[in-house]
């Protein structure tokens, strides 16, 4: 994606309140390109700034000085963003094409004129009922064709528009709340405003999106506005626009908004994991779906197979079992969909190469059958009922509905004739793999939002010019709960739910970013406990360490077993074995005779080279449960370090008896043999280990020369011995 480092640097100066330096650097930049930029506005800002400085130097006490300084900073920021937009178009074929495509529209554009055109379209469509029937269809097609061209021009105009003025914001709000303008047009405008504000922050566009979210009664529009203002909310700009905090705080005072933001965050994560879900469907669900049907997918399409009578004789219950597996797979897929998984992404991602999707606005249009790009297919007689039913009953986002209609002629030719005939005759109803979605479900805000997010996800993943945009699903924007604008708001009460969800999805780093956004006064025991667990698992070094987090938790609840266990483990991971031993022994005093804790005590004793004490405890644990592999593993290693090789080897023989022994057991057994001077035996085990770990990042050289180097030297081996072994294994 295009980036102008010089202009971004000037923007950062403004965000640091360095107005004077920003003016100077911006002036130098504009003078470098005098043929491309008009310096008139900058000169006016510079003169006003100089006037402010002159009054300040003379010692005048101006009560409006700070306000004027901020106003000039904002004016410069707006001018800077407009120059950034011009520069972007000069370096981007997509934005230049969008600008040129809407050039005629741009020259005559006015919001009042736009509103009149949109209202006229609604009126003209309503008046079609008065047209003679033989003229109605052609007139209808003409109206929709003209309107689609208007939509495309409007979209291109908005995504290449400069900063919005206050009066433009008010006029657009009036248009977006007007009941006389089609909701589909309003939804498209909101999407375009979102894209524009994401590319170049505009306070008025952000404010407009929040106002639409608060005031509209159209739920589809409301959900688009929600996604729009959340993705456009750039906390870094709050130093220039502190009213952003006030706007967001006001929104977060509403419980419905808090619930919707929480749902939105979870839905965004499900979109981000579409590839993983697609792989699950491909490997775990589709095989059973196909096996459970008497169909086969061939190059010629879906073929109905005759029943295998011999199979029925040999395995009379196989059909029933296959059917049960198929139904279970269907339920699993429907459950994934209900939870929020994007189950159709992989399939429909192959259907975005139609020319229809080369027009950017088409990715954001709500689905309507009269769209000139699909109307001729929608109205065809063959397979019409099948097409209409499948698009209305399945949980398809608008983008996928357009894809399905465009690909329908190909789909139709691959459907079994008998299946199609039954549907067309009303004898059967087609059902999407994810199951039918009742109208009641489709009318819920969460469903509407999920479908819109899937539209966006497809655009940012599949559109041919996607690299020209900031992808909110691949950047820090995706974890909206880490946005600093939500810090200190009532939304913090919902942070634990999102953190728990992220942890279950193995997204520890993202969970940490949410926890870090909790305000200091809200950081209690649970905060430090979870943060400690995350940092211990992720080994993240920024901010408080895992040990420090658990220590804070214990200061609040000294005898909490979870916190004490985490504290002990984190100390051990930092190789602070004596402190870890104290923590584990303290934990053992709270939970006497806990084998897991006793084993940890033994491990700490070994690392402190208190082998005899460790051995005594390990023998006790082994006596109580002789088949406990965890205990036997540590016992064998302790015996090895004590030089009791024969006893250790007997235990290793048992541990290595499994089909796939652990890498640690292979390595430690090899060390035991090597210390015993059985070089050939050690070599054999090292080779087994390397073979087993061939597809991993394991490095035996690193183990011998770095991780365990000191240990090897302590037990009589030399650097020459180590190099000879490595050379032998490499030969």
Q: Positions of the model-derived regions?
A:
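Alpha-solenoid helical-repeat scaffolds
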Residues: 365-557, 562-569
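Residue-level recognition of tetratricopeptide repeat
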Residues: 11, 231, 500, 533-535, ...
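TPR alpha-solenoid repeat register
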Residues: 494, 527-528, 563, 597, ...
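Structural motif corresponding to the intra-repeat A-B loop/turn of tetratricopeptide repeats
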Residues: 16, 505, 538-540, 574, ...
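Short coil turns that delineate tetratricopeptide repeat
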Residues: 34, 522-523, 558, 592, ...
